C-alpha cells in the first residue's frame, strides 16, 4: 500500500511489481498486503483489516508500507525485527531515514529510475512513482539478496558508518 504522489487517482493501494519481489527471494511475511492483491508475497500476508503494524512479525519480511506520516512506524518495526527488506521512497534527508535506515539498516539498493507500481487489479499504474525508490535490507541474509539481485541501481553496504558503493 502507499500514498505516494498526486497522480494516484485517489487510490491508496499500489502493488510492488512482481519483478522486484522475484529478484529478492521468498518471504515469510508481507504485513502490508493489499485487500485485492493479485499475487501473494509472503507465506503469511496481513491486509489493512489485520493491522499488520500491531501483529507479531515472524521470519523474513517484505515491507512496502503505506506511504505518509506513519511510514516511520513501519520502518521502526522492521528495524527492530532485523530480518527483512523494505521498499520506500529514497527520502534520504528525512528523520525517518536517519533513524531507521542510516543508523539501523545493513544495506540499501537505490533503484535506477522510478518504479511503476501495479494497481490492485494487477495492471500497471498510469504513472511512475512520484519520487525515486530504494530497497532497505535489515540483516546479512537480506543484504546478500539485495547485492545479488538483478535489479539495477546503486548498492550501498552500511557498516559502522563506513560505506561501500557498488555499481549494479
Question: What are the roles of these predicted feature ranges?
Answer:
Residues 1-168:
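Class I S-adenosyl-L-methionine-dependent methyltransferase catalytic core
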Amino acid at each position: 500500500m502507499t500514498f505516494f504522489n498526486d497522480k494516484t487517482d485517489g487510490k491508496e493501494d499500489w502493488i510492488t511489481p512482481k519483478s522486484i519481489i522475484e529478484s529478492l527471494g521468498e518471504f515469510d511475511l508481507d504485513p502490508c498486503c493489499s485487500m485485492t492483491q493479485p499475487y501473494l508475497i509472503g507465506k503469511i500476508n496481513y491486509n489493512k483489516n489485520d493491522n499488520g503494524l500491531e501483529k507479531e512479525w515472524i521470519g523474513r519480511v517484505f515491507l512496502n508500507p503505506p506511504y505518509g506520516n506513519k511510514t516511520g512506524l513501519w520502518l521502526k518495526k522492521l528495524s527492530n525485527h532485523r530480518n527483512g527488506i523494505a521498499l520506500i521512497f529514497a527520502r534520504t534527508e528525512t528523520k525517518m531515514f536517519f533513524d531507521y535506515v542510516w543508523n539501523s539498516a545493513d544495506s540499501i539498493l537505490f533503484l535506477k529510475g522510478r518504479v511503476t507500481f501495479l494497481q490492485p487489479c494487477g495492471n500497471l499504474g498510469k504513472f511512475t512513482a512520484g519520487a525515486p525508490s530504494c530497497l532497505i535490507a535489515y540483516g546479512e541474509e537480506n543484504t546478500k539478496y539485495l547485492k545479488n539481485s538483478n535489479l539495477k541501481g546503486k548498492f550501498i553496504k552500511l557498516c559502522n558508518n563506513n560505506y561501500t558503493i557498488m555499481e549494479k
